[in-house]
Amino acid sequence: MTKPAKSEETRARILDAAIELFRARGFEAATMREIAAAAGVATGAAYYYFDSKDAIVLAFYGRAQRQLEPLLEEALAGKRDFEGRLRALIEVKLSYFAPERGLLRALAAHTDPAHPLSPFSAQAGEIRERDIQFFERLLRESRIKLPADLGPLLPRILWMYQMGVILFWIYDGSAGQKRTHTLTEKSAVMVSRLIRLSGFPLLRPARKAVVELVQTITG
């Protein structure tokens, strides 16, 4: 095995060991020393690859995004209508993260954008932007005529809508998270209709308010 390959294998082993420990003991309780021991490396080696548990979680998110992207491509290719494609993008993520639902629930406490583990943080920016690109593509390929003020913001709005669904799913106690799937189905229809109606003159004041709100949130 070449040195770069061995280094990548060690990094992956530490990441996998950490995720197992986070599942078993919780993110807050697990220590870097325990992670190193579980991975079979020295504590210093664990810190060489990841300077903190936060860095490990960001690496987990990054790996998940890379693994999800071909699945998201398939999801878009498998549907033709806007609602179906929007729903498919979300359902692919729910399916992928199902084994990690407990871990995501623990990490959901860190939603403050100032926290590095927040999906809204600067540290998560690259992962977030890669995901937003799929919503950009969804809108572009739908050929829905969008108002000039709303169009550039809409991919980010759809991404935030998706994050709301995922947060609901994390805490959904219904059997098989049935309520989430119902929410996704019904809300995708509503979102689609609102987007198609957004250019109507009568909705201009409401649209302006939405645009200003999103601009405030995103800075």
Residue positions per predicted region:
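Helix-turn-helix
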Residues: T2, R13, L21-A59, R63
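Hydrophobic alpha-helical connector segments
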Residues: A59, E73-A106, S118-S121, G125-I127
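Short acidic, glycine/proline-enriched loop segments that cap or flank alpha-helices
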Residues: K145-R156, Y171-A175
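Short amphipathic alpha-helical elements of helix-turn-helix/winged-helix folds
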Residues: A17-L21, Y96
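C-terminal peripheral helix-coil segments that are non-catalytic and often amphipathic
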Residues: Q133, R137-R140, Y171-G219
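Amphipathic alpha-helical packing segments from all-alpha helical-bundle domains
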Residues: L117-R143, P152-G164, T182, A188-R193
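Secondary-structure edge/capping motif, primarily at the C-terminal ends of alpha-helices
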Residues: A75, K79, L107-H115, S142, ...
